[in-house]
A protein has these predicted regions:
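Beta-strand-loop-alpha "switch" segments that mediate conformational coupling across diverse proteins
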Residues: 160-165
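N-terminal beta1-alpha1-beta2 submodule of the flavodoxin-like/Rossmannoid cofactor-binding fold
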Residues: 1-86, 90-109, 113, 169-172, ...
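Short, glycine-/small-residue-rich phosphate/pyrophosphate-handling segment
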Residues: 112-159
Length: 193
């Protein structure tokens, strides 16, 4: 199997969110699967223009914006699992991931043109990894609900959201409990894909 991971933390490889991604990757790759990680803060991803240029071709993304989304479109189309990984700062994902989500749902769901087409993501699985400063059920609940609806609309299978709370900058994030919970989530995703 193959996974496409959209990682969207401004703190990069030293972030708490990246720690969860690394645990997920360790479990995923140990099972013999491939993964491609895109660090969205290192890429140029423009917001969707809602121009509907992508709707003229029902077989490919065909986005008219020439930026770093092109390899992401291809990776998503080749993957069985899509993973969104973002810290939760204002009850939702960071801006680069939101821009990528908007571009994906327009370019890969051919629902918005003169004739209705398919979702090119139909049947793929999606899960999310998040970190936050509040309790996960109070910080990531809106993102969780948004992803449920996003999946229903785009005809993906929603496998769930895993979140971990960081108690503050002066405290250690990656505790044995957080690491164990993240690995367990990854194992469950393996069984569900």
């Amino acid at each position: 199997m193959r996974a496409c991971i959209l990682f969207a933390s401004p703190r990069g490889k030293d972030s708490n969110t990246r720690a969860l991604v690394d645990i997920f990757l360790r479990v995923w790759r140990a099972a013999g699967h491939e993964a491609e990680v895109f660090s969205l803060y290192d890429l140029a991803i423009a917001p969707c223009r809602a121009c509907r240029g992508c709707q003229s071709d029902h077989t490919a993304p065909h986005c008219v914006i020439d930026d770093d989304m092109t390899p992401i479109f291809e990776s998503v189309l080749q993957s069985d699992l899509i993973v969104f990984a973002s810290p939760i700062y204002s009850w939702y994902c960071t801006a680069p991931l939101k821009a990528a989500m908007d571009r994906l749902v327009y370019a890969l769901c051919k629902f918005y043109g003169d004739t209705r087409g398919p979702s090119l993501m139909e049947g793929k699985a999606l899960c999310a990894l998040t970190t936050c400063g509040y309790r996960v059920d109070r910080a990531a609940d809106l993102f969780d609900e948004g992803l449920r609806r996003w999946c229903k609309h785009a005809r993906l299978r929603w496998l769930g959201l895993h979140g971990a709370r960081h108690m503050g900058y002066g405290t250690q994030f990656l505790t044995p409990e957080i690491e164990e919970n993240a690995a367990e989530f990854a194992e469950n995703i393996l069984k569900s894909v």
